[in-house]
From Swiss-Prot:
Homodimer. It catalyses: 6-phospho-D-gluconate + NADP(+) = D-ribulose 5-phosphate + CO2 + NADPH. This is 6-phosphogluconate dehydrogenase, decarboxylating. It comes from Drosophila simulans. Gene3D superfamilies: 6-Phosphogluconate Dehydrogenase, domain 3, N-(1-d-carboxylethyl)-l-norvaline Dehydrogenase, domain 2, NAD(P)-binding Rossmann-like Domain. One of its GO terms (molecular function) is phosphogluconate dehydrogenase (decarboxylating) activity.
Length: 481
């Protein structure tokens, strides 16, 4: 029968399959398609057996089975695969039909596709989908953006299948063009930062001689307080996990992979001129971890400090680590929201920052109680320039900063790398410093490159000094350093 499906989904990897089953469970008829048609038959005969999911053996067949306006969702690898499918779909669709990209696409690609498809009368949505396989099946966080005219058409489906937090759907329209995928990219960057901070806390505790079970207990305590979050919870579970050979974690090779979204966030921060230092360090930490053979060799020839990791009051220091982790986490999110604010300004997106925090409250990897505090901050002050200036977070850092400084200082003394904890502290101190040494930096630039400088109290007026008496008096306009 033609025209019976509410939506089609292309891409039957685990995420795609689980999203289809989620939609089916919520009462929507889904048409499943995969480039390898045999996979469609296999899915219908196994995971989707007994459901209302239907299959298609070609894109033309798939489109014919959709109700109008047609809605087609792609869950395929970002890049050329998305463009290939769009190219094949365009001749089969009509004006007003919707194409949704639910993969990890670069936001610039999403903006480009929006512009191209708008000329053809087609609606395009780039939606972040977070929560992994379990989230896709039972309720992900969804971050749709693109052509806003598509939102009323997909809203009933998206808000039915997404996670809920305090009864509110973890899905709302984000903004035009690539806004949805940009917000998802920042989400993933923050995820990198959260994971790195937790790893540094683990490394310090391990260096202090705590066993896996003791560390698991500590993370369990933290998860019942202000650090309550999915990542803290799974860290506890990972530390407790045993197989036939004992604790598994210590046998896992210490080299971390990455799919690129953290790197995209760091690159975007540089492009927009926003100091998202913690996420950058989290990305570089993964790069450093990949140098396993070099690190093993260096460990035998490069000497560290003679001071061993030990404290007089372990209970207090473990509490210090908790506070350090919490304070650094605040900085990480503050930086992420700074990046979204600057991107929104340049791209003319109308982002709802409180709404974004709510979208991340459930279903996604960075879900935590902490996000409720961020939502409250932006709800009470929609134009808040930085989370650090919100009373709740300002007081939290005031309470925890002595512990934070103690942990970072001791880690340095003991030779334990804490790039995320320390760069967060440096950012905090830099942000609260009224006068930084950038005056010297600008003088240096003027000395060797005649780049000019402004004087205090004379902002907007640019001066150049002939520092040596032998150089010229003309300021530079091309050479930049």
């Amino acid at each position: 029968m033609s025209g019976q499906a509410d939506i089609a989904l292309i891409g039957l990897a685990v995420m795609g399959q689980n999203l289809i089953l989620n939609m089916d469970e919520k009462g929507f008829v889904v048409c499943a398609y995969n480039r390898t048609v045999a996979k469609v038959k296999e899915f219908l005969a196994n995971e989707a057996k007994g459901t209302n999911v239907i299959g298609a053996d070609s894109l033309k067949d798939m489109v014919s089975k959709l109700k109008s306006p047609r809605k087609v969702m792609l869950l395929v690898k970002g890049g050329s695969a998305v463009d290939d499918f769009i190219q094949q779909l365009v001749p089969l669709l009509s004006a007003g039909d919707v194409i949704i990209d639910g993969g990890n696409s670069e936001y610039q690609d999403t903006s480009r596709r929006c512009d191209e498809l708008a000329k053809l009368g087609l609606l395009y949505v780039g939606s972040g989908v977070s929560g992994g396989e379990e989230g896709a099946r039972h309720g992900p966080s969804l971050m749709p953006g693109g052509h806003e005219a598509a939102w009323p058409l997909i809203q009933p489906i998206f808000q039915a299948i997404c996670a809920k937090a305090d009864g509110e759907p973890c899905c709302e329209w984000v903004g035009d063009g690539g806004a949805g995928h940009f917000v998802k990219m920042v989400h993933n960057g923050i995820e990198y930062g959260d994971m790195q901070l937790i790893c540094e806390a683990y490394h310090i505790m391990q260096s202090l001689g705590l066993s896996a079970d003791q560390m698991a207990d500590e993370f369990g305590k933290w998860n019942s307080a202000e650090l309550d979050s999915f990542l803290i919870e799974i860290t506890r579970d990972i530390l407790k996990y045993k197989d036939g050979k004992g604790h598994l974690l210590e046998r896992i090779r210490d080299t971390a992979g990455q799919k690129g979204t953290g790197k995209w966030t760091a690159i975007a921060a540089l492009q927009y001129g926003v100091p998202v230092t913690l996420i950058g360090e989290a990305v570089f930490s993964r790069c450093l971890s990949a140098l396993k053979d070099e690190r093993v060799q260096a460990s035998s020839v490069l000497k560290g400090p003679s001071t061993k990791a030990e404290v007089a009051n372990l209970t207090k220091f473990l509490d210090d680590i908790k506070h350090a982790l919490y304070c650094a986490k605040i900085v990480s999110y503050a930086q992420g929201f700074m990046l979204m604010r600057e991107a929104a300004r340049e791209n003319k997106w109308r982002l709802n920052y409180g709404g974004i925090a709510l979208m991340w409250r459930g279903g996604c990897i960075i879900r935590s109680v902490f996000l409720g505090n961020i939502k409250d901050a932006y709800t009470s002050q929609p134009q808040l320039s930085n989370l650090l200036l919100d009373d709740f977070f300002k007081k939290a850092i005031e309470r925890g900063q002595d512990s934070w400084r103690e942990v970072v200082a001791n880690a340095f003394r003991w030779g334990i790398p804490v790039p995320a904890l320390s760069t967060a502290l440096s950012f905090y101190d830099g942000y609260r410093t009224a006068k930084l040494p950038a005056n010297l930096l600008q003088a240096q630039r003027d000395y060797f490159g005649a780049h000019t400088y402004e004087l205090l109290g004379q902002e907007g007026q640019f001066h150049h000094t002939n520092w040596t008496g032998t150089g010229g008096n003309v300021s530079a306009s091309t050479y930049q350093a």
